[in-house]
């Protein structure tokens, strides 16, 4: 038992602390976003700044660029949510969730797939990037999914579940163990986020229907 504890302690001592800080802040962002808290965006801003450097250092260039984009979207997301959230409350009850139809998402996915293939080809042939196609696919779809979060679109969580599952393989291959663990947790939190937002969406839909009946 003592040997196991010593081995575990030694393992955590060797972990890259910059990655651990980024991991914890990213986890805070996802949990806060799932709960509808405006404070998710400051956590996102700091974590993405750290991950921009971390991914560049291991030649996951598209992931590095993606986190640079996240950095900007953290500012935009905070601004968008603050317009539609009571700053005194800042909780999930203040969220106004929307849902976009399946046809719209199918068209978006087809366009994003074409874009990802084109960018993947460029990354494979003109950069030293590892896993250029998978890295590009997760990046392109994550860009889109992040925009959906800022617009409070219910289906964003379904995109994140798929993106996070693909990312788990990518980070295992690059030996980014803390980040791999983080993305396993992300899959769970994204599932929770979808069900949480679905309830809020259904609740707001009932309110709108009731309002329409009482105010013809």
Question: For the regions a protein language model found, what residue spans apply to each?
Answer:
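Membrane-water interface of transmembrane alpha-helices
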Residues: 69-88, 198
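Hydrophobic, membrane-inserted alpha-helices
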Residues: 22-29, 46-52, 140-145, 161-169
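Membrane-helix interface "capping/anchor" motifs
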Residues: 31-42, 147-159
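Membrane-interface helix caps and helix-loop-helix hairpins in membrane proteins
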Residues: 56-63, 122-130, 149-153, 172-177
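Membrane-proximal helix-loop-helix units in multi-pass membrane proteins
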Residues: 81-141
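C-terminal transmembrane-bundle signature of multipass membrane proteins
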Residues: 156-161, 166, 171-174, 178-209
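Short, strongly hydrophobic alpha-helical membrane anchors
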Residues: 1-17
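Early transmembrane hairpin module of multi-pass membrane proteins
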Residues: 24-29, 37-77
């Amino acid at each position: 038992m003592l040997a196991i504890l010593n081995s575990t302690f030694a393992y955590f001592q060797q972990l890259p602390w910059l990655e651990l800080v980024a991991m914890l802040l990213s986890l805070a962002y996802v949990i806060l976003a799932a709960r509808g808290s405006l404070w998710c965006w400051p956590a996102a801003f700091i974590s993405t700044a750290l991950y921009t450097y971390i991914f560049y250092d291991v030649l996951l260039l598209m992931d590095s660029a993606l986190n640079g984009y996240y950095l900007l979207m953290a500012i935009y997301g905070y601004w968008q949510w603050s317009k539609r959230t009571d700053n005194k409350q800042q909780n999930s009850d203040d969220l106004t969730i929307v849902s976009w139809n399946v046809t719209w998402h199918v068209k978006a996915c087809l366009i994003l797939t074409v874009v990802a293939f084109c960018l993947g080809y460029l990354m494979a042939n003109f950069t030293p990037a590892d896993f250029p196609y998978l890295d590009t696919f997760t990046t392109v779809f994550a860009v889109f999914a992040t925009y959906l979060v800022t617009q409070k679109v219910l289906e964003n969580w379904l995109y994140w579940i798929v993106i996070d599952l693909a990312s788990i393989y990518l980070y295992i291959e690059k030996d980014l163990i803390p980040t791999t663990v983080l993305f396993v947790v992300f899959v769970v939190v994204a599932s929770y986020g979808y069900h949480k937002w679905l309830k809020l969406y259904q609740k707001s839909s009932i309110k709108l229907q009731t309002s329409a009946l009482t105010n013809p």
